[in-house]
């Protein structure tokens, strides 16, 4: 039965600086005039995640080919080129993402093509049209989400990347605080999870690194009710390591009705 099942111990990863994160979020909300909700700039989201021990792979916003080449030279080849246009973001199938770009000539050609594709779509407000990012090792793309429920607090979601996951609702959910057993269960719950464990002859991936990311996000979300929503997309799980390539965070006034129902007694 559920009560007899092994429930593990609450996760407490080292290097999660929740108090500092809360002060930082408060300063951003103050500077913005205390809006009901504020979407953080990418660099702010990365700074917040760093306080939880989660590193976002470096990227540079760019407007044109010259800026893109300069960014790639700073980051080191090869790089990825990504459109920030919402309709093309994360959409390699539509041409909005170009991977393993190895030199300036290839990058310039890709910039021209991606900008042409983006011309028919609404831009992302206040953002450069493109970003250049350091390449991460190849692996399986996953998505980590957290949303703040006024009654239950943070609800953590996990699934593999791609349209199929969203269309089929192949996501697993858990309410924080999480135990090590909860974290292991949420990674294994989606129907597509076997892709992380050596499916059809593929090498097993570094699930422990993915679980560490989930644990850190869960603790940050539990300690920071001002973090209304978070999405890490994608988190690429490789043979060694899990790499956060994109993050969006929305913050605002805390509205959590914390209580004993969020942590049932044993």
Regions found by a protein language model. Name each.
Residues 1-266:
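ATP-dependent carboxylate/acyl-activation modules
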